């Protein structure tokens, strides 16, 4: 899994409307930085024994990684209208993230949010989860451990609390929503490569992240958007800011939350991948 907000050097939201040359150059530069951090992580995974690496371009509509500079050994899932948030994660032996940001409400988290800037927070079984936590929970459904994260210091602390022993690399430290103290991209890549290699060595000792079923999900929005008379399908309106969903497992939760359909999984497991 990849994201953009946790990449070294990134401190502002991506502006998809500004068509100025300055913004175009900034976006191209950030796409290259992300691809180079992915390459660094992949190099570490391969050095640690991975036979293949499948990359999920997870920022926005899945168009952010600069494929022109990507390691040719890698495969990428990108684009929108996906059958699931993390398609083919069940084909992997371990999972990880590059470019991680902290969850919504993290006081000093640089560009912290959970799925959308409109969300105040997600909780599953009263456990506060950001995007990494959801990734870990989906992986845990398939008994896949979450072994590595690189990104903001506060994102690293977040996943360490959920997955003790997970190897993390803080390439920057958020000072506020739009400010961070960052390593140079070249230094960040060195750190990521070494961290990913160590993560592969530690993978066998890490337990998958799981929560007891049934899952009780709560979403709180910053603005009042819910109407008790017209609840979202499969959800219960608690108040104008909050809905709750109960599901047998995390797959059913995502089906109800994001309207994914059952049956998207591949029928057979391909070669082991990280």
Question: What kind of region is each of these model predictions?
Answer:
Residues 9-38, 163, 168-171:
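A short alpha/beta connector and helix-capping loop motif
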Residues 77-116:
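N-terminal glycine-rich phosphate/adenylate-binding segment common to multiple enzyme folds
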Residues 1-2, 56-57, 95-99, 149-150, ...:
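Short beta-strand segments
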Residues 80-81, 116-142, 150-154:
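Active-site glycine-rich loop that binds ribose-phosphate moieties when present
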Residues 138-146, 150-200:
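Active-site rim beta-loop-alpha module in soluble metabolic enzymes
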């Amino acid at each position: 899994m990849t994201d953009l907000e946790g990449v070294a050097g990134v401190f502002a939201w991506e502006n998809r409307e500004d068509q100025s040359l300055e913004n175009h150059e900034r976006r191209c530069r950030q796409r290259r930085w992300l691809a180079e951090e992915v390459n660094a992580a992949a190099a570490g995974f391969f050095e640690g024994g991975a036979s293949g690496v499948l990359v999920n371009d997870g920022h926005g509509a899945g168009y952010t990684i600069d494929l022109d500079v990507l390691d040719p050994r890698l495969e990428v899932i990108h684009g929108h209208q996906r059958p699931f948030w993390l398609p083919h994660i069940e084909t992997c032996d371990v999972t990880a993230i590059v470019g991680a940001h902290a969850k919504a409400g993290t006081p000093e988290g640089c560009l912290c949010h959970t799925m959308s800037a409109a969300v105040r927070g997600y909780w599953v079984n009263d456990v506060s989860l950001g995007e990494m936590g959801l990734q870990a929970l989906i992986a845990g459904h398939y008994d896949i451990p979450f072994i590595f994260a690189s990104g903001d210091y506060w994102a690293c602390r977040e996943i360490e609390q959920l997955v003790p022993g997970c190897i993390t690399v803080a390439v920057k430290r958020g000072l506020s929503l739009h400010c961070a103290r960052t390593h140079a991209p070249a230094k960040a890549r060195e750190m990521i490569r070494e961290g990913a290699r160590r993560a592969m060595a530690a993978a066998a000792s890490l337990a998958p992240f799981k929560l007891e079923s049934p899952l009780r999900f709560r979403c709180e929005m910053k603005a009042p958007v819910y109407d008790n008379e017209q609840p979202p399908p499969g959800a219960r309106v608690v108040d104008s800011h909050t809905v709750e969903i109960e599901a047998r497992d995390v797959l059913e939760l995502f089906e109800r939350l994001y309207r994914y359909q059952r049956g998207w999984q591949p029928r057979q497991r391909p070669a082991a991948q990280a």
